[in-house]
């Protein structure tokens, strides 16, 4: 039983490390993407701050990466503690499991929502909005748009990984409630 728990903690640690790396890569790729082009004799620079949804994505992805790194430290601690044979207090581990579940859900929803919002803003930059007389920006800033597209893929992969982690957190919560715990005596 202890060996199975240790392998679960290790698997969670690997997945958290992957999510942290994906979210950090998405944040860095969005945050550091710039391109300068000359348009009608005027030099224009495209940055992440030009589209507020991209700025929000960069901040949310950075926060998600930090959260996953903190949870990864928790996995290392629990892996050492469970591997050493120590058994944490049942009530405090139940509260910790609930806290991790709620934080994982919040991180998954936030990462997914900001990535989708940034993707929606990028569709307007890709196709333009003729009714509003907005031109296609990706024809001008091709490299910038390609970098943003890459960061959107990384952000979505991080969101999917976080959703899988929240399912594992839910399983961890329900493990604390055995069928005999609340049976009528």
From Swiss-Prot:
Residue spans crossing the bilayer: 13-33, 53-73, 106-126, 148-168
Membrane association type: Multi-pass membrane protein
A GO term from the CC aspect: plasma membrane
Keyword Transmembrane helix: yes
Pfam families per record: CASP_dom
Keywords attached to this entry: Cell membrane, Membrane, Transmembrane, Transmembrane helix
Topological region Cytoplasmic: 1-12, 74-105, 169-185
UniProt keyword Cell inner membrane present: no
Residues in compartment: Extracellular: 34-52, 127-147
InterPro entries per UniProt: CASP/CASPL, CASP_dom
Localization (cell): Cell membrane
Subunit description: Homodimer and heterodimers.
UniProt record similarity statement: Belongs to the Casparian strip membrane proteins (CASP) family.
Name of the protein this chain belongs to: CASP-like protein 2C1
